[in-house]
Amino acid sequence: MSDVEEAVEEYEEQEEAAEEEHEEAVEEEAGGEAEAGEPCTAEDGEEEEGREAEDGPVEEFKPKPRPFMPNLVPPKIPDGERVDFDDIHRKRMEKDLNELQTLIEAHFENRKKEEEELVSLKDRIEKRRAERAEQQRIRAEREKERQTRLAEERARREEEESRRKAEDEARKKKALSNMMHFGGYIQKAQTERKSGKRQTEREKKKKILAERRKVLAIDHLNEDQLREKAKELWQMIYDLEAEKFDLQEKFKQQKYEINVLRNRINDNQKVSKTRGKAKVTGRWK
């Protein structure tokens, strides 16, 4: 049952109850007026007096108590207009249908927005995944290049170390061969005696740098040979800088380890001192 039918039934029940109460009120008023409005003639008065004398005193008339009920006033319908309940029901159904259609359209719009957001989210995830894979690939390539470069530098350093050792061995052999000749030994002793003092570290450094420094003979080189020479010098500088960086890192690590060991030694000394004091105090006690 729809809301319109329920409203119509309630309205009809209220109208019937109001009509019944109105009829009861009209009947009661009509009965009271008939009793109070009858003319009293002389004969009637004499007859009533005779009856009163015969029958005794007549009880006074008491009005019937009326139940307390508010008067329900039915709604007034203007003349010439009729209420079409079918039209009201039809309008109500059209309104409900419009609301339902609005809700359905809103639901589908929200669902469409959610699907679009889901698609965009998936696209962002795929894009981010591709970017991450590309970054990992680039990082792996860079790591591979770094490992290759480190391996090449390590091999180069080992080669230089072996070459340096070979040169040192050759120099030692040459010195031993020179020392075997007595004259050469005397000459060396005389030169040392003439110098009168030992070489300082700075002089030794200058001497070593002078030995390592080579003269660049580039006057007879053409353009391609100059480019190759420049590349060779650049590679040498690069290798020296790499070796310098490795030595600096090694120095930092050794310095850190020295500080850690020093702190451990200090802590151990403090602990040993406190233990010794505790033993002494316990002994004296």
UniProtKB/Swiss-Prot annotation:
Residues 66-77 have a biased composition (Pro residues). InterPro entries: TNNT (IPR027707), Troponin (IPR001978), Troponin_sf (IPR038077). GO terms for cellular component: troponin complex. GO terms for biological process: cardiac muscle contraction; regulation of muscle contraction. Residues 1-83, 111-206 are annotated as: Disordered. The modification N-acetylserine is found at residue 2. Residues 1-58 have a biased composition (Acidic residues). It comes from the Eukaryota. Keywords: Acetylation, Muscle protein, Phosphoprotein. PANTHER family: TROPONIN T (PTHR11521), TROPONIN T, CARDIAC MUSCLE (PTHR11521:SF5). Troponin T is the tropomyosin-binding subunit of troponin, the thin filament regulatory complex which confers calcium-sensitivity to striated muscle actomyosin ATPase activity. Belongs to the troponin T family. This is Troponin T, cardiac muscle. The gene is TNNT2.
